[in-house]
């Protein structure tokens, strides 16, 4: 059995680093729309949490804890290409996933691997007759455990107690609540408004459809997949919340020239396309979001008035101010607010295209050159319409409707060249060597984004929510745009795997990364690693345990990884054009727009470095029916890249520096 490692594969029993393998069948069994959702509970040492609970939204993931001040997301390598979007993949397209957890395993990826590496292999072509497979499943989702909220009776008791504590008396609730309804509240026959239940979408549907076609012969193989996923939100009753995605995948490999059993020249490609649409309730943060609004809402008041319109707290004003405050008047009707704000009418769309082409040349036995170029293109758009409304006099209103439209697109490319040589000495000494280089490029002319916001539209609905349809009295129109960021990265790497009779293993890796995010004096970072393993079960003195002990391996490793995750070109000063850059020059009666500095330079910025020591044991018992793996590790990250408050006399608010240390064990 082999596992995927950086830029190649290796026998599983010879791996000296800490890795996890998850097979595609185990992912597909989970029946989820997201790959990372399927990995939950299958990857020890990897913490995976939903970012928001919104259908189709991504996940927060950390491998062995948070070791950096920036994002804890690992590096995703999809079909040999770094930096892919795992959230764009259809779980049914996955052949296998390998997780590299320690620095000894990750060092081959250098600066991008400080948070670990997740290697994704999509389904490849297989030799044999053409096979067509269609998988479909339909399920329903419900809120597993609903928060226990105060009933109307409990809420009134709490408010009365608050009044007592402030030196007052109990409220006369009959002033604000209909007599029959008040009696029902007080005797417990009516618990009041359950705001969470009001927005809960019971039996929210989730469905997956996947069509896969594979086939080929000894010279040509292919695999094609088409998928469609749809998911309803469990909090999408009043405002629609859903996610839908279409995916297409085509992988093929062809032997161009063969000598005997050796494939001298092979070519292939991996193409993946995704189109996604989503809409949903406003997420916000832990203090400002739809769910928290429902949790704080008063159970004594209804969702609707008797006339069928949304209940408004201003309706209670004439009944007496003391009781009015007991109804949390400064919090508007949360469902009405949800409908009239961003949750009410919004839609996001995105397109992703990943294309990889490669050539493999094997001029002699054991020597293989691989040249690969990867192209990524993406675009996204988001539209939102906010209608005119008034819920109370405390600010929960909008005098003019508002529409927003954001569009962005971009592309980048990566060139990778590797040379792999495998050879043996005296049959017992096995060597697997690799050298390579990689170049990544993204430039301002490779993409851009444009954002527009207008107050006042002609048609007053979401279907026509475009800036070009603003009315003649539109105010506060804001249009902004910017090019894609500039970043280039050049890397060189080498690896040597050695084993003696598959009992004693040694791996050494070195990678050098140069990034445009740092000044020429600090541009290059060097990240080494070394690891060793001992397959004890292969020793002669262990022969007596062969009936119950299948495999026993000790391993240890040390390595370094880097991180350059910060906005581009922070090491040098920047300039900006705008309202703060106006100059009178020779005419004191009018100003001319010019440039002004917008950030402090720091030419001393350098690589953030993560150093890790790992010791582990792998065992298998009873003919593979029972397995056990344990790891001890110590990870220390130094020279953290952080944005700190700048000295006030500089005229700037923040500056990027290296500072701080984080340790994980």
Where are these regions (language model features)?
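Extracellular/periplasmic, surface-exposed regions of secreted and cell-surface proteins
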Residues: 27-30, 73, 79, 203-208, ...
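Short, glycine/acidic-rich hinge or "gate" loops at secondary-structure transitions
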Residues: 55, 282-287, 388-389, 542-549
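Core alpha/beta catalytic barrel or barrel-like domain that forms the active/cofactor pocket
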Residues: 291, 390-392, 507
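Conserved small-residue
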Residues: 133-187, 277-306, 314, 440, ...
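A contiguous, mid-domain pocket- or channel-lining segment that forms the substrate-recognition surface
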Residues: 85, 305-308, 380
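Acidic/polar loop-and-plug regions of large Gram-negative outer-membrane beta-barrel proteins
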Residues: 169, 174-191, 274, 279-352, ...
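Short, small/polar-rich motifs associated with maturation and membrane association
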Residues: 1-250, 255-258, 262-267, 354-355, ...
């Amino acid at each position: 059995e082999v596992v995927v490692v950086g830029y190649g594969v290796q026998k599983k029993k010879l791996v000296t680093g800490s890795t996890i393998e998850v097979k595609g069948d185990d992912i597909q069994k989970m029946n989820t729309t997201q790959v990372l959702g399927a990995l939950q509970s299958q990857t020890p040492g990897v913490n995976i949490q939903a970012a928001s609970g919104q259908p189709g939204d991504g996940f927060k993931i950390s491998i062995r804890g948070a070791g950096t001040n920036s994002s804890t997301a690992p590096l995703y390598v999809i079909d040999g290409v770094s930096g892919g979007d795992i959230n764009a993949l259809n779980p049914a397209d996955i052949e296998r996933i390998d997780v590299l957890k320690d620095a000894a395993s990750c060092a081959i990826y250098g600066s991008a691997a400080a948070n670990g590496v997740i290697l994704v292999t999509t389904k490849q072509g297989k030799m044999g007759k053409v096979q067509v497979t269609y998988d479909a499943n339909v399920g329903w989702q419900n809120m597993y455990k609903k928060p226990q909220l105060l009933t109307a009776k409990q809420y009134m008791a709490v408010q009365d107690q608050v009044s007592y504590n402030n030196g007052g008396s109990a409220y006369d609730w009959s002033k604000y609540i209909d007599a029959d309804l008040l009696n029902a509240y007080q005797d417990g026959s009516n618990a009041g408004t359950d705001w969470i239940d009001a927005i809960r979408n019971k039996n929210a549907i989730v469905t997956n459809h996947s069509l896969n076609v594979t086939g080929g012969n000894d010279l040509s193989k292919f695999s094609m997949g088409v998928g469609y996923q749809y998911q309803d939100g469990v909090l999408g009753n009043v405002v629609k919340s859903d996610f839908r995605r279409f995916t297409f995948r085509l992988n093929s490999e062809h032997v161009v020239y063969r000598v005997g059993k050796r494939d001298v020249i092979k070519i292939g490609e991996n193409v993946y396309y995704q189109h996604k649409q989503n809409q949903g309730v406003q997420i916000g943060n832990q203090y400002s979001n739809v769910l928290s609004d429902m949790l704080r809402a008063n159970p004594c008041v209804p969702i609707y008035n008797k006339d069928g319109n949304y209940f408004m707290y201003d309706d209670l004003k004439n009944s007496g101010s003391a009781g009015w405050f007991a109804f949390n008047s400064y919090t508007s009707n949360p469902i009405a607010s949800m409908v009239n704000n961003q949750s009410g009418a919004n839609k996001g769309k995105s397109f992703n295209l990943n294309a990889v082409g490669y050539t493999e040349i094997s001029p002699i036995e054991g020597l293989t050159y691989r040249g690969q170029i990867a192209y990524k293109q993406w675009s996204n758009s988001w539209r939102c319409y906010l209608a005119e409304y008034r819920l109370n006099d405390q600010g929960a209103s909008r005098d003019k409707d508002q529409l927003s439209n954001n569009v962005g697109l971009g592309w980048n490319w990566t060139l990778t060249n590797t040379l792999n040589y495998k050879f043996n000495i005296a049959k017992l000494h096995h060597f697997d060597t690799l050298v390579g280089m990689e170049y990544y490029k993204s430039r301002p002319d490779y993409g851009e984004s444009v954002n527009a916001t207008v107050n006042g539209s002609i048609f007053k609905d979401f279907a026509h929510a475009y800036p070009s349809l603003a009315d003649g009295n539109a105010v506060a129109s804001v249009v902004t745009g910017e090019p894609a960021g500039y970043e280039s990265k050049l890397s060189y790497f080498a690896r040597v795997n050695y084993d003696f009779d598959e009992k004693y293993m040694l791996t050494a890796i070195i990678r050098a990364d140069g990034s445009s995010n740092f000044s020429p004096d600090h541009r290059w970072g060097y990240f080494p690693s070394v690891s060793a393993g001992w397959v004890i079960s292969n020793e002669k003195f262990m022969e007596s345990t062969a009936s119950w002990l299948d495999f026993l391996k000790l391993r240890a490793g040390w390595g370094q990884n880097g991180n350059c995750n910060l906005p581009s070109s922070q090491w040098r000063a920047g300039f900006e054009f705008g309202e703060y850059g106006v100059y009178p020059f020779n005419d004191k009666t009018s100003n001319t727009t010019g440039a002004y500095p917008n950030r402090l330079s720091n030419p001393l910025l350098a690589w953030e470095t993560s150093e890790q020591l790992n010791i582990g044991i792998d065992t298998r018992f009873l003919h593979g029916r029972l397995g056990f793996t344990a790891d001890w590790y110590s990870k220390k990250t130094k020279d953290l890249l952080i944005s700190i408050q700048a000295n006030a006399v500089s005229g700037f608010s923040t500056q990027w520096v290296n500072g701080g240390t984080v340790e994980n064990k």
